[in-house]
From Swiss-Prot:
This is ATP synthase subunit beta, chloroplastic. F-type ATPases have 2 components, CF(1) - the catalytic core - and CF(0) - the membrane proton channel. CF(1) has five subunits: alpha(3), beta(3), gamma(1), delta(1), epsilon(1). CF(0) has four main subunits: a(1), b(1), b'(1) and c(9-12). It comes from Nicotiana sp. ATP binds at G172, G173, A174, G175, V176, G177, K178, T179. The keyword Amino-acid biosynthesis does not apply. NCBIfam families: atpD (TIGR01039). The lineage of its organism: Eukaryota, Viridiplantae, Streptophyta, Embryophyta, Tracheophyta. CDD domains: ATP-synt_F1_beta_C (cd18110), ATP-synt_F1_beta_N (cd18115), F1-ATPase_beta_CD (cd01133). Belongs to the ATPase alpha/beta chains family. The gene is atpB.
Length: 498
């Protein structure tokens, strides 16, 4: 966002040098500003505080108007640190909301909440900007057709399919593979759908944001040689930023994604990590603005704020935004207002399991805990639905038998249960898959598996046709033909050893 008030561009009006406002009160990241009569800014307008601090360094702080207080005063929330600000400093109304660069030039770059690049790669090569505040698409613009968003990841497509233009909650602790799964989805949407991705880092660790950027460069998701060939734009408002920046960075990322959907007519993946931090920042701002807190100390406008973000994430007749949102659950309490409000908007949940991660099953998506509203016969078809249900039943029965196996051993099971356990172990291994973005670590080429191939593979395992193959043959392969080929190779190797 350009904050020189005499310059046009970046969605900020060309303004004459007019009588500015003055800072009259500073409470942490919240400022009260007095304007001359008749010159009051609108709600959500961007203000710029200009001046010099006590050692003569220039100050340029962007703020957003949140309340009109009367007596020609407004209350605004700062988007960067307010260190060095003093009462009486000049404040200029830009006449428009915060506006950020959009379009292909944003790919491969890292931005802050104001749309300023923070990756030391120079200015963004675009004059196209969009305001971060806008209405959700009108009902008549929406594409209400229910369609599956194929990811090429077997466990997701079969058991908890994503809806095109839907919202997915990604649940998982530290180190279970959220980042790798996110990068694989970014890679696959670019290859299979010709789509792009936008990653919004909302209130998470700066180190994690840096690690993600480095891993994306290493795996080719961000192309260092030709930045225009990159598949993702990154927008960061990390946990050291003021609450205003953390509250608005999700909208900045969403605005960039909306341009790809509405103007470029592409399918877009929008990642938000972490949606809880968006609510948390809103809660901090709400208290500073003097609003009465609601349940558990959250802001009274919690549902409205969440709705204004989530309702813009949808499919239109031009394209779609499919959003994957990491959800932190405070104290593992699912009834906490923040996660409870988030759940109301989700179409699917992808739960990552530390137990599967310990077994070496990657991706470590829990097939029994992950859910989707799309897994209905009228949407996915009878064949897909039946196969998914039989896979879940087999895995559920295996889970129930594990205590007996641990105490008494496999030999104490009935013949029928032994067969079921063998098939369940094959299914568990067949749900694993080599990822394109993990090639540099594993040395094995990544695999994109179409939905029809996935269904065929699991049907063959369930039917018993592959009972004679060793379970190791199903581990980290793509489709079922690769599993049978791997079984033959394993047999040849064992024969050679003999």
């Amino acid at each position: 966002m350009r904050i020189d008030p005499t310059t046009s561009g970046s969605g900020v009006s060309t303004l004459e040098k007019k009588k500015p406002g003055r800072v009259v009160q500073i409470i942490g990241p919240v400022l009260d500003v007095a304007f001359p009569p008749g010159k009051m800014p609108n709600i959500y307008n961007a203000l710029v505080v200009q001046g010099r601090d006590s050692v003569g360094q220039p100050i340029n702080v962007a703020c957003e108007v949140q309340q009109l207080l009367g007596n020609n005063r407004v209350r605004a929330v700062a988007m960067s640190a307010t260190d060095g600000l003093t009462r009486g400093m000049e404040v200029i109304d830009t006449g428009a909301p915060i506006s950020v660069p959009v379009g292909g030039a944003t790919l491969g770059r890292i931005f802050n909440v104001l749309g300023e690049p923070v990756d030391n790669l120079g200015p963004v090569d675009t004059s196209t900007t969009s305001p971060i505040h806008r209405s959700a698409p009108a009902f008549i613009q929406l594409d209400t057709k229910l369609s599956i968003f194929e990811t090429g990841i077997k466990v997701v497509d079969l058991l908890a399919p994503y809806r095109r233009g839907g919202k997915i909650g990604l649940f998982g602790g530290a180190g279970v593979g959220k980042t790798v799964l996110i990068m694989e989805l970014i890679n696959n949407i670019a290859k299979a759908h010709g789509g792009v991705s936008v990653f919004g880092g909302v209130g998470e660790r700066t180190r994690e944001g840096n690690d993600l950027y480095m891993e994306m460069k290493e795996s080719g998701v961000i192309n260092e040689e030709n930045i225009a060939e990159s598949k993702v734009a990154l927008v960061y408002g990390q946990m050291n930023e003021p609450p205003g920046a953390r509250m608005r960075v999700g909208l900045t990322a969403l605005t960039m994604a909306e341009y790809f959907r509405d103007v470029n007519e592409q399918d877009v993946l929008l990642f938000i990590d972490n949606i809880f931090r968006f609510v948390q920042a809103g809660s901090e701002v709400s208290a500073l603005l003097g609003r009465m807190p609601s349940a558990v100390g959250y802001q009274p406008t919690l549902s409205t704020e969440m709705g204004s973000l989530q309702e813009r994430i949808t499919s239109t007749k031009e394209g779609s935004i499919t959003s994957i949102q990491a959800v932190y659950v405070p104290a593992d309490d699912l009834t906490d207002p923040a996660p409870a409000t988030t759940f109301a908007h989700l179409d699917a949940t992808t739960v990552l399991s530390r137990g599967l991660d310990a077994k070496g099953i990657y991706p470590a998506v829990d097939p029994l805990d992950s859910t989707s509203t799309m897994l209905q016969p009228r949407i996915v078809g009878e064949e897909h639905y039946e196969t998914a249900q039989r896979v879940k039943q087999t895995l559920q029965r295996y889970k129930e038998l594990q205590d007996i196996i641990a105490i008494l051993g496999l030999d104490e099971l009935s013949e029928e249960d032994r067969l079921l356990v063998a098939r369940a172990r094959k299914i568990e291994r067949f749900l694993s898959q080599p990822f394109f973005v993990a090639e540099v670590f594993t040395g094995s080429p990544g695999k994109y598996v179409g939905l029809a191939e996935t269904i065929r593979g699991f049907q063959l395992i369930l039917s018993g046709e592959l009972d004679g193959l060793p379970e190791q043959a199903f581990y980290l392969v793509g489709n079922i033909d690769e599993a049978t080929a791997k079984a033959m190779n394993l047999e040849m190797e064992s024969n050679l050893k003999k």
